[in-house]
Amino acid sequence: MTGTTLFDRRMLEALVCPVTQAGLAYDADRQELISKQARLAFPIRDGIPIMLVSEAREL
């Protein structure tokens, strides 16, 4: 396995924003899940989305 684990896009079907419960968009370049309604970007580390508001980046 390489140093980067890819995010499985099928997870987007089950994941929602923890703030708004709205759907998320995947930013492959930045390895983030984007909540447009909450204006937050949740990081993906080693293929695992970190869905903690405290870890999110404000947009």
Swiss-Prot record:
GO cellular component: cytosol
Signal sequence, renumbered to the chain: none
Name of a matching Pfam family: Trm112p
InterPro entries from the UniProt entry: Trm112-like
Similarity field: Belongs to the UPF0434 family.
Designated name of the protein: UPF0434 protein RHOS4_00640
